[in-house]
Amino acid sequence: MSIFPAQPSDKKAVEEGAAFMPRFDASGLITAIVTDARDGELLMVAHMNEEALRLTLETGIAHYWSRSRKTLWKKGETSGNLQSVVELRTDCDQDALWLKVHVAGDGPTCHTGRRSCFYRQVVSSGGKVALTMVSDHDQ
């Protein structure tokens, strides 16, 4: 049984109401966009299932659902770079979340050791598309 109420057919209640009614997709997931609460840097995009969202709300520490490992994932549990949630928002139809976080430890969010998972820029030139590295300082 879900702790979150089902979305009503009344679109206005979803878009303008005060009830938090997250809309999970057919796989039981909701997209989570994560930014640094201090400077707004985009850190990562992940997914949450109902349990991950519930634990995030209960503990104030970001939890996600790993689609590749098919398991619950407390971000930073192994590295020490836990994500403390400062603010949690939802979009207009409540099918995406935005987490503003403080990252503990030395700050990397990406499993590659970088601050952000978005460390490459897509560049199109002369009919060719390539990736170029973006330094952590440029992010």
UniProtKB/Swiss-Prot annotation:
Mg(2+) binds at D91, D93, D95. Catalyzes the hydrolysis of the adenine ring of phosphoribosyl-AMP. NCBIfam families: PRK00051.1. Its EC number is 3.5.4.19. InterPro entries: PRA-CH (IPR026660), PRib_AMP_CycHydrolase_dom (IPR002496), PRib_AMP_CycHydrolase_sf (IPR038019). It comes from the Bacteria. It catalyses: 1-(5-phospho-beta-D-ribosyl)-5'-AMP + H2O = 1-(5-phospho-beta-D-ribosyl)-5-[(5-phospho-beta-D-ribosylamino)methylideneamino]imidazole-4-carboxamide. The gene is hisI. Its main location: cytoplasm. One of its GO terms (cellular component) is cytoplasm. GO terms for molecular function: magnesium ion binding; phosphoribosyl-AMP cyclohydrolase activity; zinc ion binding. Pathway: Amino-acid biosynthesis; L-histidine biosynthesis; L-histidine from 5-phospho-alpha-D-ribose 1-diphosphate: step 3/9. It is an enzyme of class 3 (hydrolase). Its cofactor is Mg(2+); Zn(2+). This is Phosphoribosyl-AMP cyclohydrolase. It is found in: Cytoplasm. Keywords: Amino-acid biosynthesis, Cytoplasm, Histidine biosynthesis, Hydrolase, Magnesium, Metal-binding, Zinc. Binds 1 Mg(2+) ion per subunit. Binds 1 zinc ion per subunit. GO terms for biological process: L-histidine biosynthetic process. Homodimer. Zn(2+) binds at C92, C110, C117. Belongs to the PRA-CH family.
